[in-house]
């Protein structure tokens, strides 16, 4: 596999002529570069006017390689050729280097360029690219490739330091070298026109009297700041090393190279706006700096942003009233690392009410607006603090978390949101502090953790404590003056929604869909629509094979009243057949039977279970687990039951006798109740391990909940 490298633009704040003179001081030998043994000139050409100078050198290197590699290769030194082409008129130097040793087995190519900064003619820019292709090296291709990459990366960091050293040495003797001018060129530049004014010393040396900074130098700083804070980059901009250090952070030479590769590749093949450098770096980190994988991720994200008009979401999308009033989340100052901090009181969130009142689309847009806002806040923090801030912190308060938060449509909506964020906002989460985690949290974590990237999971820290102990732990991550009041601090969070139950009057109307349902909408894809008639209940038989499972359910009464009960039987019971997806007498009885059922319904004794009429309450084979509760039209109910025994559980909905008794005998509409329902079994085996691993999180101190990374086979453990 060909290994490539491309450097960002490195800037020397010295004129091109000074940099070139310092560069030549490295030859024929350079003690500052230990592996550089020496060089000899093999070819040299100078133009008559002195504007062009081409020189070829054969250089000798003492490569630091394992003894075995040197022994097999049979050499102590390696040789490469270097061709320097200097054009004083254009003020450029092009360097081409290739290996001589083992050229049939290894191909090494390096190209470097020195040129004048486009916005400041007294600065010099440097760019570098290289490629390595190990074809065949005595069966040690992988080892040689890793060795070469490591050595090359180590020498890159020294390159600028060494040239800066020679520049400083040169400036001790002279501070000005005349530019090349053609013989017939008139001298039109006066001392007052020059950006650098010189003064000659008594010993003949010259010094800088006034280094007048060009106007564009200040503009460059503004442009860099704008580029760091904007969502998208200038398509023609180049990466500069100082800009990377200032706005993106300290990167290794190879990481800088990968950033340059993906940026310039996207610029060459993609028309239109691109994610800014900070966001490109996030994609690279999410894919371990694999340029090909990161590029695929960026392409998919660009398409997704266009399809959903994400670039304008902060300007065009308005939060619905229910979100403004009842969504308990907001931005809240910053953590100790300077990262913007978002607080979400998830335990106070009515997941069902929020989803039923504003829909999946608005909740997704809410998340996207938070992420887009977070990117802007991180960029603003970078500008304000003078240090790179590329992510934000999330504090999740789980006080109030219960089984109702495990409502399947809500969990499915959450998983969809996680999927979108992982794909389009990678590496934006600096840390996640989960506080006041109750015992039900392991169940929720088991459901969502497989969909969270492993790197992100490692950033989750959980605490189950409260009060003063929790406050002390929070002080390790958050300045005391910023700790929220509901977590024991003094900082008010007045811009957060209240949370709590969303009034049913704000619910959107439920559209019943007979037959096929939308797979995109968890409300429609999850629920089953059915009807129960007087004397003909709806019964759902649920076999539980292992004790310790949790049965959860949710239903909405759409028309008339119904009565809900939960039974348990030690007997094996089959689910009754249902025709056309609805368990109603219209598909079972003929009209005469329906009239007879209505007439005799008041006096006829119905069995406790329609699916097993031989079983009676009070016998060892059948018992009532949840007493009958009457729900009226428009009611919504979420519930859960801990299955302490294995056996058969039966959920039953029936028309209550009280409702039927007050209606006309032939008023068939009052004997029918329509509802939608769903249920889910949470198997104890799926979260038993999570419960055990999270027991340590019951204390007030924060603990990581990410599983330990298994050691690579053959890798010794740390003692």
Swiss-Prot record:
Highest taxon in the source lineage: Eukaryota
CDD domains given for it? SEC14 (cd00170)
Domain (PRELI/MSF1): residue spans on this chain? 2-175
Q: Which PROSITE patterns did the record assign? A: CRAL_TRIO, GOLD, PRELI_MSF1
Please state every residue range assigned to the domain named CRAL-TRIO: 319-495
Q: Region Disordered: start and end of each range?
A: 700-719
- Per UniProt, residues of the GOLD domain are 524-681
Q: Where is the composition biased (Pro residues)?
A: 707-719
Q: Cellular component per GO?
A: cytoplasm
Q: Which SMART domains match?
A: CRAL_TRIO_N (SM01100), SEC14 (SM00516)
Name the PANTHER family for this protein: PROTEIN REAL-TIME, SEC14 RELATED PROTEIN
Listed name of the protein: CRAL-TRIO domain-containing protein T23G5.2
């Amino acid at each position: 596999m060909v290994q490539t490298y491309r450097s960002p633009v490195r800037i020397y704040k010295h004129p091109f002529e000074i940099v070139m003179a310092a560069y030549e001081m490295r030859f024929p030998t350079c003690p500052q570069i230990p592996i550089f043994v020496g060089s000899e000139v093999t070819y040299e050409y100078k133009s008559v006017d002195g504007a062009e100078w081409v020189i070829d050198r054969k250089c000798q290197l003492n490569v630091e390689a394992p003894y075995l590699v040197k022994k097999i290769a049979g050499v102590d030194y390696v040789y490469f050729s270097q061709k320097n082409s200097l054009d004083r008129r254009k003020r450029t130097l092009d360097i081409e280097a290739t290996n001589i040793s083992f050229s049939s087995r290894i191909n090494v190519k390096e190209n470097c360029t020195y040129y004048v900064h486009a916005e400041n003619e007294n600065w010099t820019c440097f760019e570098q690219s290289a490629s390595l292709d190990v074809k065949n090296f005595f069966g040690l291709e992988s080892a040689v490739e890793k060795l070469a990459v490591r050595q090359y990366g180590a020498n890159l960091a020294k390159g600028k330091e060494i040239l800066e050293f020679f520049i400083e040495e040169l400036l001790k003797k002279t501070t000005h070298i005349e530019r090349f001018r053609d013989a017939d060129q008139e001298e039109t530049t006066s001392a007052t026109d020059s950006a650098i004014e010189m003064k000659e010393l008594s010993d003949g040396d010259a010094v800088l009297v006034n280094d007048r900074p060009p106007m564009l130098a200040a503009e460059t700083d503004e442009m860099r700041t704008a580029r760091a804070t904007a969502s998208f980059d200038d398509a023609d901009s180049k990466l500069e090393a100082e800009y990377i250090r200032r706005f993106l952070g300290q990167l290794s030479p190879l990481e800088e190279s990968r950033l340059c590769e993906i940026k310039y590749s996207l610029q060459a093949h993609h028309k239109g706006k691109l994610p800014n450098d900070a966001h490109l770096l996030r994609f690279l980190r999410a894919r371990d700096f694999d340029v090909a994988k990161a590029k695929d991720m960026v392409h998919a994200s660009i398409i997704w942003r266009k399809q959903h008009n994400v670039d304008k979401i902060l300007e065009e999308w308005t939060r619905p009233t229910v979100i403004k009033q009842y969504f308990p989340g907001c931005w809240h100052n910053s953590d100790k690392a300077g990262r913007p901090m978002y607080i979400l009181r998830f335990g106070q969130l009515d997941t069902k009410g929020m989803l039923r009142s504003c829909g999946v689309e608005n909740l997704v847009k809410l998340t996207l607006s938070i992420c887009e806002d977070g990117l802007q806040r991180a960029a603003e923090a970078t500008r304000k603090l003078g240090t790179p801030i590329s992510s934000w912190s999330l504090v999740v308060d789980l006080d109030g978390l219960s089984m109702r938060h495990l409502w399947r449509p809500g969990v499915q909506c959450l998983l969809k949101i996680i999927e979108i964020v992982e794909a389009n906002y990678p590496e934006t989460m600096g840390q996640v502090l989960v506080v006041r985690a109750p015992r039900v949290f392991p169940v929720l974590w088991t459901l969502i953790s497989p969909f969270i990237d492993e790197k992100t999971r490692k950033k989750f820290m959980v605490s189950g404590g409260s009060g003063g102990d929790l406050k002390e732990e929070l002080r390790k991550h958050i300045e005391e003056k910023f700790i929220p009041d509901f977590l024991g601090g003094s900082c008010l969070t007045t811009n957060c929604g209240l949370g709590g139950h969303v009034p049913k009057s704000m619910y959107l109307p439920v559209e019943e869909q007979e037959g096929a349902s939308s797979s995109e909408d968890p409300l429609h894809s999850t629920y089953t629509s059915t009807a129960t008639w007087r004397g003909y209940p709806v019964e759902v038989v649920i076999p539980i094979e292992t004790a310790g499972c949790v049965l959860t359910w949710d239903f909405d009464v759409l028309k008339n009243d119904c009565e809900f009960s939960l039974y348990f039987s030690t007997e094996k019971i089959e689910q009754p057949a249902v025709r056309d997806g609805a368990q109603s007498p219209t598909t079972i009885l003929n009209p005469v039977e329906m009239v007879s059922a209505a007439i005799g319904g008041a006096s006829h004794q119905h069995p406790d279970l329609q699916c097993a009429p031989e079983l009676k309450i009070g016998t060892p084979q059948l018992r009532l687990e949840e007493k009958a509760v009457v729900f009226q039209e428009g009611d919504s109910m979420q519930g859960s039951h801990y299955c302490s025994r294995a056996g058969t559980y039966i959920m039953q909905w029936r028309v209550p006798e009280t409702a039927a008794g007050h209606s006309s005998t032939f008023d068939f509409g009052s004997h029918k109740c329509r509802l939608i329902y769903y249920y889910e079994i949470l198997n104890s085996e799926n979260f038993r391990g999570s419960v055990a691993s999270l027991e340590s999180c019951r204390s007030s101190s924060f603990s990581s909940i990410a599983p330990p990374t298994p050691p690579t086979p053959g890798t010794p453990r740390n003692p």
